[in-house]
């Protein structure tokens, strides 16, 4: 897949959760241009075209949506969100937290940092797939981004 034609960047360390998300998006034909990275550090490399993505990606080719977990190795989703919102080139990118954390401090911190939406992953696959369908439909088809 061309790293410059990504609609969704999925940042998820749990392979089972990543697979469920991808399956949910595929079920509704919204996973054609999805790219998955397993941690926050690689997410920033991808977004900012650094590290192993240096010379392979154009930073101006932004994903239409970033689905971001909070609890990850190397760099948390909150730290990734801070970096995205702190850079003029990426501060308007749509970021949706997709996590199992229902902790009020996590929710509050993410909204303070400018997250577009905070979604707690439903436990049942059918509910999860429906949530993913609605999320993809809204962010990829209905939403009009400023960029």
Annotate each PLM feature:
Residues 57-61, 85-92, 113:
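Conserved phosphotransfer cores of two-component systems
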Residues 1-9, 15-35, 41-44, 48, ...:
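Non-catalytic signal-transmission and effector/linker regions of two-component phosphorelay proteins
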Residues 36, 74-75, 92:
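Residue-level signal for the "D+5" position in two-component response regulator receiver
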Residues 116:
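Short, glycine/charged-rich "phosphate-handling" switch motifs in NTP-dependent
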Residues 121:
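A Lys-centered signature of the CheY-like receiver
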Residues 70-72:
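Receiver (REC) domain active-site loop signature in two-component systems and cognate sites
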């Amino acid at each position: 897949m061309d790293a410059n034609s990504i609609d969704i960047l999925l940042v998820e360390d749990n392979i089972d959760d990543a697979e469920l998300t991808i399956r949910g998006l595929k079920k509704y034909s919204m996973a054609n241009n999805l790219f998955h990275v397993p941690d926050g550090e690689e997410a920033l490399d991808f977004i900012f075209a650094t590290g192993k993505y240096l010379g392979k990606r154009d930073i101006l080719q932004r994903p239409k949506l970033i689905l971001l977990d909070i609890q990850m190795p190397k760099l948390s989703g909150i730290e990734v969100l801070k970096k995205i919102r702190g850079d003029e080139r990426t501060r308007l990118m749509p970021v949706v937290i997709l996590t199992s954390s229902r902790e009020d401090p996590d929710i509050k911190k993410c909204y303070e940092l400018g997250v577009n939406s905070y979604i707690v992953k439903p436990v049942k696959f059918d509910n999860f797939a429906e949530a993913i369908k609605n999320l993809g439909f809204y962010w990829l088809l209905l939403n009009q981004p400023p960029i």
